[in-house]
C-alpha cells in the first residue's frame, strides 16, 4: 500500500526520531500559542523553557537544533520575544560563538600533539586511579586558561582517536587502513567481529575519563576570569583584573578544587556511580602497539609538526592568560598558524575542522532566542527580587543556591549575566554596598559554575560532549551523564555553599584587604564602562 501524503509528512518530520517524540514536539507547537494568548505569557515562557530543556534531554533521539529551533521560531512569531532581541542576545554573546567557530576548529589542527601527549599518558600509566586523576588535573589546569569547550574538544578528539584505533585493529585491519569506526560490530557475513565484553569495558573506561575531564573543566574554569565566558562578564562588571579575580574566588574555589580531586579518587577507588571501569589488557596492548608504530614511522617532517603545534599551544595559553585578544580571535590565529606552518592549504582539509562545532554553534544561537524570551517575559524577576530582600551572609548563600538551581536547567552564561546585571543595578540604586556587591559577584560566579555540573543543560562543555559524534559510540546518554555527575554535583555544591555559609569567604576577603592583596573598590568604578579585555 503506497504511503499517503500525511504519512510522508510525518515520516519526513524530524527524520528517524521516534513517533512519540514527533507527536510531543507537534503538541508543544500547538500548546504554546494557546498558553501565551489565553492563559499567561509568564506561564507560556516557563513552559517554553521546560520544552527546550526536554529537547536537550532527548539529544540522542534527535539533535536539539531542529525541535528547539521550531519552538524558537514560533516564540518569535507569536510575540514572546522579537527578532531584534534575539539578535541583541547573539551580539552580546558573539565571543562565545566565535570561540565555538574558531577555537574548536583550531584545536582540530593541534590534535596530533594532543593525541601524542594523551596516548603517552594512557599507555605509560597503568593505574586507572592515577590516569583518572591526571585527566581531571590536566583538564582543570587547561580550562583555567582555555575555555572549557576547548578542553572538552581536546579530550573528545583524544577519545575518538583511541576508539577508532581499537575499532580498526579489532576489525582485522592495520593502523594505516581506512575504516569506519562508527559501524556496528559485524563483518560482511553479519557475524560479530569485535569482542563485546572487551568493547563495553573500553567504552566504560572512556566514559569515566570524559566525565572526570568534564568535571575537571568546571573545577579549573571557575578559578580564573578566562576560564568560562560568564567569568569574563562578571569580572568586567566588577572591574577586576586576572589576578584579583583569582584571589577573590580562592576562598571558595580552593576548598572545592581539593574536594573535587578527592571525589575523583573515591569514585574510582570504590567503583561507584558507574566509575572504576578498567582498560582491558587487549585494548591496552593495541594502544601500546599503535604508540610504538607511530614512534617508529615518525619522520622529521612529523616531528617538526609536533614542535610547531607545541609552540602554538604556548601562544594559545599565553594569549588567553594575558588576554591579548578575544578568545575567538586567538582561535582564528591558531587555525592560521597551525595550517600555514604545517602545510594544510587544501580547502576541503580546512572544512573538516569546522564540522564538529558548527551544528552546536547553530544550537547555541537558537538557545539565545530562548534567553530573549526569558528576558522579555521577566521569568527570573521574582527569584532575584526575593534574594535581594535578604541581607549579609544569608543573601550570599541565597544567590549561590539560586544561581546553582537555575544554572542546572539553563545556560550558565545567561544565568551569570542576568544575576550580575541585577546585582549591579541594586548597587547603583543604593540597595547594597560596594563590598557586598564584590562578595555577591563571587557567590554568583561560583554558584553559576559549580552546581551546573549536575546536567548537560548548565555546562556548555557537557552539552557539547553529549551532542558530539563520540557520545553514541561510547553509549554516553543524558541520564548516564547526570548519574555519573551526581557525586561531583553533591560534593562541589555542598563544599561551595559551606565556604560561604560559615563565613570563610567573608573572613578571607577581609584578610586579603588587610594584607593589601586586593583593594576596596568604589561604587563610582562600577559606573565606568565595563571592559573584559
Curated annotation (Swiss-Prot):
Top-rank lineage group of the source organism: Bacteria
Residues passing through the membrane, by range: 10-30, 67-87, 96-116, 131-165, 209-229, 247-267, 310-330, 355-375, 396-416, 454-474, 485-505
Gene Ontology CC terms, in alphabetical order: plasma membrane
Keyword Membrane belongs to the record: yes
Catalytic activity of the protein: 2 Na(+)(in) + 3 H(+)(out) = 2 Na(+)(out) + 3 H(+)(in)
GO molecular function list: sodium:proton antiporter activity
Subcellular localization: Cell inner membrane
InterPro entries in alphabetical order: Na+/H+_antiporter_NhaB (IPR004671)
Membrane topology: Multi-pass membrane protein
Keyword RNA-binding applies: no
One Pfam match: NhaB
Keywords: Antiport, Cell inner membrane, Cell membrane, Ion transport, Membrane, Sodium, Sodium transport, Transmembrane, Transmembrane helix, Transport
Similarity section: Belongs to the NhaB Na(+)/H(+) (TC 2.A.34) antiporter family.
Functional note: Na(+)/H(+) antiporter that extrudes sodium in exchange for external protons.
Protein name (record): Na(+)/H(+) antiporter NhaB
Organism whose genome encodes this protein: Shewanella oneidensis (strain ATCC 700550 / JCM 31522 / CIP 106686 / LMG 19005 / NCIMB 14063 / MR-1)
Amino acid at each position: 500500500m503506497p504511503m499517503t501524503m500525511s504519512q510522508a509528512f510525518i515520516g519526513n518530520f524530524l527524520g528517524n526520531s521516534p513517533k512519540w517524540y514527533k507527536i510531543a514536539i507537534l503538541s508543544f507547537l500547538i500548546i504554546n500559542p494557546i498558553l501565551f494568548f489565553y492563559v499567561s505569557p509568564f506561564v507560556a515562557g516557563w513552559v517554553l523553557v521546560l520544552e527546550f530543556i526536554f529537547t536537550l534531554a532527548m539529544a540522542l533521539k534527535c539533535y536539539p537544533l531542529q525541535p528547539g529551533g521550531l519552538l524558537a521560531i514560533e516564540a518569535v512569531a507569536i510575540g514572546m520575544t522579537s527578532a531584534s532581541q534575539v539578535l541583541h542576545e547573539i551580539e552580546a554573546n558573539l565571543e562565545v560563538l566565535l570561540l565555538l567557530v574558531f577555537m574548536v576548529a583550531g584545536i582540530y589542527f593541534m590534535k596530533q600533539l594532543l593525541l601524542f601527549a594523551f596516548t603517552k599518558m594512557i599507555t605509560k600509566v597503568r593505574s586507572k586511579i592515577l590516569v583518572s586523576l591526571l585527566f581531571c588535573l590536566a583538564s582543570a589546569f587547561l580550562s583555567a586558561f582555555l575555555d572549557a569547550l576547548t578542553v572538552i574538544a581536546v579530550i573528545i578528539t583524544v577519545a575518538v582517536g583511541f576508539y577508532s584505533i581499537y575499532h580498526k585493529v579489532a576489525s582485522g585491519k592495520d593502523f594505516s587502513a581506512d575504516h569506519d569506526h562508527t559501524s556496528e560490530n559485524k563483518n560482511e557475513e553479519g557475524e560479530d567481529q569485535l569482542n563485546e565484553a572487551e568493547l563495553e569495558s573500553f567504552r566504560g573506561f572512556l566514559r569515566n575519563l570524559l566525565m572526570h575531564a568534564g568535571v575537571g573543566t568546571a573545577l579549573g574554569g571557575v578559578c580564573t576570569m578566562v576560564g568560562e565566558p560568564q567569568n569574563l562578564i562578571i569580572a568586567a562588571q566588577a572591574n577586576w583584573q586576572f589576578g584579583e579575580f583569582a584571589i577573590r574566588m580562592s576562598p571558595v574555589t580552593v576548598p572545592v578544587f581539593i574536594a573535587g580531586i578527592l571525589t575523583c579518587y573515591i569514585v574510582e577507588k570504590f567503583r561507584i556511580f558507574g566509575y572504576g571501569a578498567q582498560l582491558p589488557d587487549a585494548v591496552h596492548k593495541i594502544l601500546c602497539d599503535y604508540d610504538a608504530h607511530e614512534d617508529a614511522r615518525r619522520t622529521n617532517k612529523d616531528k617538526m609538526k609536533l614542535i610547531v603545534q607545541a609552540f602554538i599551544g604556548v601562544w594559545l595559553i599565553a594569549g588567553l592568560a594575558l588576554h591579548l585578544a578575544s578568545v575567538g580571535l586567538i582561535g582564528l590565529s591558531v587555525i592560521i598558524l597551525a595550517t600555514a606552518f604545517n602545510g594544510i592549504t587544501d580547502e576541503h582539509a580546512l572544512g573538516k575542522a569546522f564540522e564538529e562545532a558548527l551544528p552546536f554553534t547553530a544550537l547555541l544561537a537558537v538557545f539565545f532566542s530562548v534567553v530573549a524570551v526569558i528576558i522579555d517575559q521577566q521569568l527570573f524577576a521574582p527569584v532575584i527580587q526575593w534574594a535581594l530582600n535578604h541581607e549579609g551572609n544569608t543573601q550570599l548563600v541565597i544567590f549561590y543556591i539560586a544561581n546553582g538551581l537555575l544554572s542546572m536547567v539553563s545556560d550558565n552564561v545567561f544565568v551569570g549575566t542576568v544575576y550580575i546585571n541585577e546585582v549591579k543595578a541594586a548597587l547603583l540604586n543604593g540597595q547594597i554596598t560596594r563590598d557586598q556587591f564584590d562578595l555577591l559577584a563571587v557567590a554568583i560566579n561560583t554558584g553559576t559554575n559549580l552546581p551546573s555540573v549536575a546536567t548537560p543543560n548548565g555546562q556548555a562543555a557537557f552539552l557539547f560532549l553529549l551532542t558530539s559524534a563520540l557520545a553514541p559510540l561510547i553509549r554516553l546518554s543524558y541520564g548516564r551523564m547526570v548519574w555519573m555527575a551526581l557525586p561531583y554535583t553533591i560534593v562541589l555544591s555542598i563544599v561551595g555553599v559551606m565556604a560561604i555559609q560559615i563565613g570563610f569567604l567573608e573572613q578571607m576577603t577581609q584578610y586579603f584587604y588587610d594584607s593589601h592583596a586586593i583593594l576596596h573598590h568604589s561604587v563610582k568604578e562600577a559606573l565606568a564602562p565595563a571592559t573584559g579585555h
